[in-house]
Amino acid sequence: MTNLKLLDGRSLSLHDLHRIIYEGETVGASDESMEKVKQSRKAVEQIVADEKIIYGITTGFGKFSDIFIDPDDVENLQHNLIYSHACGVGSPFPETVSRTMLVLRANALLKGFSGVRPLVIERLLALVNANIHPVIPQQGSLGASGDLAPLSHLALVLLGEGEVFYKGTKTKASFALKEEEIEPITLTAKEGLALINGTQAMTAMGVIAYLEAEKLAFQSEIIASLTMEGLRGIIDAFDEQIHFARGYVEQVDVARRMESYLQDSQLTTRQGELRVQDAYSLRCIPQVHGATWQTLRYVKEKLEIEMNAATDNPLIFDNGQKVISGGNFHGQQIALAMDFLGIAMAELANISERRIERLVNPQLNDLPPFLSAAPGVQSGVMILQYCAASLVSENKTLAHPASVDSIPSSANQEDHVSMGTIGSRHAYQIIQNVRNVLAIELICAMQAVDIRGREKMASFTKKILEKGREHVPYIDQDRMFAKDIERAAKWLKDGSWDFTKMREKERTNHY
């Protein structure tokens, strides 16, 4: 893609980020925002020249904030900050997260409150456009005073140090910069602090988690529709009158979509035909899935605010006339949103696993035990339910809120922190587990409807089944099902799913 997205510090959306992250859209900076950057930079240079005592510009950091820094040591101060704070550990963030961090940090600096030179922003954008993505360890951030350790690893690359992902491999930053003819920079007053004082690690991880979660939320309804057919579920539960009586718009949306997917099915039933009511995991799909959608809307709102937020400290206002120390680096808003996201997505896996149980348990349906082609000789999909149960149980541990914890740091100067980056990492892992649980439900549901007879399926779900069988063949004998789960999950993650039909059933006046 050759389209150019101009960042301005105030209008970046999740839709924009999706194009930049996954479609390779290039980025630049708006002229208006760059003018603001230049004005705030003049203020920083004047503060240094006048030897004013301003935190982070002419003082040390954290507990050292009461130590004045000589003008001759200002550059050294900024470089020492990056080197000393680049102490993350663990596996690196996914490359998509690293790319998102670059975009978000540039966008925050373009608000013009941080006092960096335009050159710093230009270099960040150059890395994005050259597909040079810093290798950033996932562990080590408290989520206040910003994501210090992760962003320090990002900042190292601007100096020509550290490691990057480049052309599919991990290599030295100096090599990648040379290949792309990007000159390393020397940091001057406040620039080191401006690069690392922010919430861009937790927010970037949150963006990727959200984008994957939204796709899974749609897919979970389609998979549940297949399960409804496999279990001859009662369609009356999706009558919109029930859901209007409750009043939650997201619940109504889910019910409408489910009813639409199944509208011409000969496998679903009406109340009283086979049974009076279905179990909750079928009957309450709109209520449970709808509640997850409520959470997704909330998380989206918070992410898009944070994506365009000034999270530095201090901030420069009124064309440099006012420099104020504050706490916009504190990640509590995103920390809470990420905990909420993890909990809501874990619930999709919880209810999915219960539907899996109903598909494989012969006491709960009239299908062959464990959907086996030769019960007894073959185990069928018995252990797939075990795997789903394990993932669901793991999610319950991961869903424990990170934001309720806080450990003081910097000699108790930073005595309350958000742990938001832990929360975003946990939410992301939960979402990976949810995808695998849904992949298992998909495998079981496809097997069930094929046993019932696909000629009786709804036209929409039949198309899904036909596409799904390209990835997971019909199970006529036991095989190594790990590969089936892997292929199904890959289809859910990377496959092209047309959500047009789904969005048609949303109440557009709400979104």
Swiss-Prot record:
Keywords: Cytoplasm, Histidine metabolism, Lyase. One of its GO terms (biological process) is L-histidine catabolic process to glutamate and formamide. GO terms for molecular function: histidine ammonia-lyase activity. There is a cross-link at residues 144-146 (5-imidazolinone (Ala-Gly)). SUPFAM superfamilies: L-aspartase-like. It catalyses: L-histidine = trans-urocanate + NH4(+). Belongs to the PAL/histidase family. This is Histidine ammonia-lyase. It comes from Halalkalibacterium halodurans (strain ATCC BAA-125 / DSM 18197 / FERM 7344 / JCM 9153 / C-125) (Bacillus halodurans). The lineage of its organism: Bacteria, Bacillati, Bacillota, Bacilli, Bacillales.
